[in-house]
Regions:
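Acidic, polar-rich low-complexity tracts and alpha-helical solenoid repeat scaffolds
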Residues: 1-356
Length: 356
C-alpha cells in the first residue's frame, strides 16, 4: 500500500496537482509502515510541491528532511541542495518585496550558512550586502563585501563590490580603506570619467588619512592620465608642490612649480583665472628661491669675481619677480614689487659690508 501511495504522490506532482500530491505524501510520511526510501521520496514530493506553490518556508523545511536522508555522494544530493538554497533565497526575495529589509538580509545570509556549496550563495551574499548598505549597517556590510571579494575573485560583480566598499568605508569614516577602494576604481574602471573622479577622491582620502606619499603618487598619475580639464590637473600639481614644500624637497618643489607655469602657459583657451592665479604664485615662489640664493651669496675677495656672481644671481631674481608681476594678480604684483626693492637694498648693504 505504501509503495502505491508513494508512486501516486509522484504521479500527482507530475500532473501539477500539488495540493493532492501534498496530501498523499503526508500520508506516507506519517505512516510507520513506510520504508526509509519511501519516506525520502514522499519528503521530496512534499518539498517540490510546496516550492511549486511558492510556499518557500514549507519547501525549505521539507528539503532539509530530504537532505538529511541522503548521502552527500548520492546522485541527486546536489540538486536537492540547490533547491534548499533557492527556497531560502526566495524567502529573502519575498521579504525584500514586502519592504522588510532586516528579514531579507537574514534569509540571504542563511543561504551561505545552510548551503555553503550552492551556486546561488554568491548572489545571496551580494544581495545581503545591498540590504545591509540600505540599513546603513556599514560594519556588517563591509565584512560581507570583503568576504565576497575574497571568495569570488572572478565574479563579474567585483567592480560593483569595490564601488560599494568605497561608499561604505567613506560612510564609516575610514579614509584609508575608502582611499584603497577608490584607487581600485581609478585604476580599473572602464569609464574614464569615473576613473578620473575616483583617482581624485582616492588622493584626497589618502591625504585625510595622512598617507602623503600615496596621495602624491595618485596626483602624479592624475596629471599624467588626465591633463584635461586643465584646471583640475593644475590643482593636482599644486597638491604635489605643497607636499614637497612640507618635506623640504626643494628640487621636486621647483620642478612641479615650473610644471604649473608651463601647463598654464601652453593651454590656450583652457586657461582659467584659477590656473593663472596658481601659475602666478608658482612664479613668485620660484622668484623667492632665486632671491634666497642671491641673498645668501656673500661678497668676498677678489671682489670683482664675487660681485659678478652676485650680480648674475641678482639679475635672475629680478627677472623672476618681473615674470611674477606680469600675471597681473594684484597680491603677487605687490609682493614682487616689494621684493624687487629689497634686492637693490640688499646689494647696497653687501657692498658696504665688503668694504669694511
Amino acid at each position: 500500500a505504501m509503495a502505491v501511495l508513494t508512486r501516486s504522490s509522484e504521479q500527482l506532482l507530475a500532473r501539477h496537482d500539488q495540493a493532492r500530491a501534498i496530501q498523499v505524501a503526508e500520508t506516507v510520511i506519517s505512516s510507520e509502515q513506510a520504508s526509509a526510501g519511501q519516506q525520502r521520496v514522499a519528503w521530496t514530493v512534499l518539498a517540490h510541491a510546496h516550492f511549486d506553490l511558492q510556499d518557500y518556508l514549507q519547501a525549505e523545511s521539507a528539503y532539509q528532511q530530504v537532505r538529511q536522508r541522503m548521502s552527500p555522494t548520492s546522485k541527486n544530493y546536489n540538486a536537492i541542495n540547490e533547491r534548499l538554497a533557492a527556497s531560502i533565497y526566495k524567502q529573502g526575495e519575498a521579504a525584500q518585496a514586502s519592504g522588510d529589509t532586516v528579514a531579507a538580509v537574514d534569509h540571504y545570509q542563511r543561504v551561505r550558512q545552510a548551503t555553503p556549496d550552492a551556486s546561488i550563495v554568491a548572489t545571496a551574499e551580494f544581495d545581503a550586502a545591498a540590504g545591509l548598505l540600505a540599513m546603513q549597517d556599514w560594519t556588517e556590510a563591509t565584512a560581507v563585501l570583503e568576504r565576497f571579494r575574497n571568495n569570488y575573485p572572478n565574479d563579474p560583480r567585483q567592480g560593483e563590490v569595490t564601488r560599494r566598499l568605497a561608499m561604505a568605508y567613506l560612510a564609516k569614516a575610514q579614509p584609508l580603506q575608502a582611499a584603497r577602494e577608490f584607487e581600485r576604481i581609478g585604476r580599473g574602471h572602464a569609464d574614464p570619467k569615473l576613473r578620473r573622479e575616483a583617482l581624485w577622491q582616492a588622493a584626497e582620502l589618502y591625504t585625510t588619512a595622512e598617507r602623503y606619499p600615496a596621495a602624491v603618487g595618485l596626483y602624479r598619475d592624475y596629471v599624467k592620465q588626465f591633463p584635461r580639464p586643465l584646471e583640475q590637473a593644475v590643482e593636482a600639481r599644486q597638491h604635489i608642490v605643497l607636499h614637497h614644500q612640507r618635506t623640504n624637497n626643494i628640487r621636486e618643489q621647483q620642478r612641479w612649480l615650473n610644471d604649473i607655469i608651463q601647463a598654464d602657459q601652453h593651454s590656450g583657451t583652457q586657461r582659467t583665472d584659477r590656473t593663472r592665479y596658481l601659475a602666478a604664485h608658482a612664479q613668485l615662489t620660484l622668484a623667492g628661491h632665486a632671491h634666497q640664493q642671491y641673498r645668501h651669496t656673500s661678497l668676498t675677495l677678489p671682489l670683482k669675481k664675487s660681485l659678478a656672481t652676485k650680480k648674475r644671481l641678482m639679475d635672475n631674481a629680478l627677472q623672476q619677480y618681473d615674470h611674477a608681476a606680469g600675471y597681473g594678480i594684484s597680491e603677487v604684483t605687490t609682493a614682487a614689487t616689494y621684493h624687487t626693492a629689497q634686492i637693490y637694498s640688499q646689494l647696497g648693504e653687501a657692498l658696504l659690508q665688503s668694504q669694511r
